[in-house]
């Protein structure tokens, strides 16, 4: 049921979407040891910095921080980020291959967004990060 909800919705053109702001987010890990692991909701925020649109997961022990880029498909964005842990300094994509994260981002409604991480380095075969606007 949780996975069906996270994967529901029809992607919309991302350039019509304002992702900036505070979100609640959670990760669903699929495959490897267990068929699915659903983590609780944590805080995330998206904002513009001097470089681009940026995402930070600000709660939980496993966090991500990175940037969004345009894709040839108008209904998705590319996310390049890096995994870091609660007490670690934020990392940038490309600094440590084992921590690099790549995902496609999909705008589903005014208050819903999803990142899909194919073949993450740790713990699963695919991660889905679900966002709901606070």
Where are these regions (language model features)?
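Central antiparallel beta-sheet cores of small beta-barrel/beta-sandwich binding domains
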Residues: 25-100
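Proline-rich intrinsically disordered, low-complexity coils
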Residues: 11-13, 35, 74, 120
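A short, structured loop/turn motif at beta-sheet edges
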Residues: 16-20, 47-50, 68-77, 105-112, ...
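Extracellular structured ligand-interaction cores
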Residues: 20, 41-43, 102, 128
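Amphipathic/hydrophobic helical signal segments and adjacent flexible N-terminal regions
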Residues: 1-18
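Edge beta-strand at a domain terminus
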Residues: 2-5, 94-104, 110-134
């Amino acid at each position: 049921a949780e996975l069906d909800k996270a994967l529901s919705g029809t992607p919309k053109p991302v350039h019509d979407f304002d992702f900036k702001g505070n979100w609640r987010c959670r990760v669903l890990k699929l495959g490897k040891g267990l068929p699915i692991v659903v983590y609780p909701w944590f805080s995330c925020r998206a904002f513009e910095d001097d470089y681009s649109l940026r995402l930070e997961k600000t709660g939980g022990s496993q966090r991500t921080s990175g940037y969004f880029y345009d894709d040839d498909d108008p209904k998705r964005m590319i996310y390049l980020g890096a995994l870091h842990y609660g007490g670690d300094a934020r990392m940038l994509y490309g600094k440590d291959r084992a921590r690099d994260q790549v995902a496609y981002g999909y705008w589903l409604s005014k208050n819903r967004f999803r990142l899909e991480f194919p073949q993450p380095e740790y713990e699963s075969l695919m991660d889905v990060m679900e966002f709901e606007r606070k």
